[in-house]
A protein has these predicted regions:
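Leucine-rich tandem repeat or coiled-coil scaffolds
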Residues: 2-9, 13-295
Length: 295
């Protein structure tokens, strides 16, 4: 059994999201193992009984490296049963749980989400968590706090199109801040990629995000597109990222920078010697703002 590691970039609109993938490949057959994938099956799994046939498959996969659950809808009972199995899968590296709550009531989602997140808190090999395209709203941000605060091995966090709003965005950012504050002496943050677009984060949560980024200085990609962030928020984010010397990708597409925000970005640019992608499209830079960036 040959093991190989793949790190690839996938374009999404104007942004590039870093994806970490691990594969255990059988040299003879070429088939992949270590992956549980029910992506896009359109399953409606309400209870433990509904999900049991799939859990039987999951339990057989050893070691487990990835789960891909999107395009199905999971209820509280199903998530709790799934969580019981995931707790035992300490080799998990990629938890792709995007788009798993379509049609679920807002009263269901917090308990279901909490079960899944809490099951992964002690997973030291976990590197990527994707919870995008789930309609959490601000009320469902708190169930993620335990995972985001206490699992300090996560390198890639994707939370796009969740309806977090200012309150939910602040909760998530504060959890990341606390995670960094809990690092032991000499221990460095592992967080490298944060994707949190289409969440109406606005200026109200920008300061919390800036404070979090300032603690995770090894970060290489930040994508906060379509969030209604205005020039004051752009300034805060640039200041928070000023010590992130390894930053390679900054995507603030479809926010409102104007001339004032452009000044903040221009001032911060010398702090990012490795920056290769700066996306400020639809940010109302206008000619003066654009000129500042090119000077």
């Amino acid at each position: 059994m040959a093991t190989w590691y793949e790190l690839h970039k996938k374009s999404s609109g104007f942004s590039q999201h870093t994806h970490i993938r691990y594969r255990n490949m059988d040299a003879a057959s070429g088939t992949s193992s270590g992956i549980f994938n029910i992506l896009g099956k359109g399953l409606k799994l309400n209870s433990k009984e509904d999900i049991s046939p799939y859990l039987a498959e999951l339990e057989k996969i050893e070691p487990l490296h990835e789960i891909h659950l999107g395009g199905n809808t999971l209820g509280v009972g199903a998530c709790q049963a799934l969580a019981d199995v995931l707790k035992t899968k300490k080799t998990l590296r990629v938890a792709d749980m995007a788009d798993i709550f379509t049609g679920r009531l807002i009263t269901e989602i917090p308990d279901a989400l909490r079960a899944l997140c809490d099951a992964l808190v002690d997973h030291e090999q976990l590197e990527e968590v994707n919870l995008s395209d789930n309609a959490f709203g601000g009320r469902s941000a708190e169930p993620m706090v335990n995972l985001l605060t206490n699992n300090r091995h996560i390198r890639v966090l994707k939370l796009s199109n969740n309806g977090l709003g200012v309150s939910g965005g602040t909760i998530v950012a504060d959890a990341l801040y606390e995670s960094a504050k809990h690092l032991k002496d000499g221990e460095k943050s592992q967080l490298r990629v944060v994707v949190c677009g289409r969440n109406r984060l606005e200026n109200g949560s920008a300061i919390a995000w800036a404070r979090a980024f300032a603690q995770h200085r090894g970060i290489t990609e930040v994508s906060l597109y379509q969030n209604g962030i205005r020039m004051e928020g752009v300034r805060a984010l640039c200041e928070g990222l000023s010590d992130c010397k390894d930053l390679e990708v900054l995507n603030l597409q479809d926010n409102t920078a104007t001339l004032r925000g452009s000044r903040s970005v221009a001032k911060a640019l010398p702090n990012w010697p490795h920056l290769r992608t700066l996306n400020l499209s639809d940010c109302l830079l206008k000619s003066k703002g654009g000129s500042l960036l090119f000077e």
